[in-house]
Amino acid sequence: MAAYVVVEVRVNDPVRYEEYRKTVAPTLEAYGGRFLARGGKVERLEGSWSPKRLVIVEFPDVATAKAWWSSSEYANPKAIRQSASETEMIVVEGI
């Protein structure tokens, strides 16, 4: 069953974050991940949540998403992202 990693990103260092953007895709592909949304326009429909940047990544399942997140392939890009931004990240199981 598909799983989705949903990330709210607040970029603090745009130059460093661009390094992350350039290095993350191959790590996703190695785990069957693909971007569904990556920083496009966000429009609130209800409530008070107003993320400036939102990313959604699809994986084959939750276990694979978690394996990617903790993988050695993602370790360096993750460190770059963590130093360049503040993020909230969840994984949700699809239907």
What are these regions (language model features)?
Residues 1-70, 74, 93-95:
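Short S/T/G/P-rich N-terminal loop/turn motif that feeds into the first structured element of a domain
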Residues 82-95:
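C-terminal end-helix/capping segment
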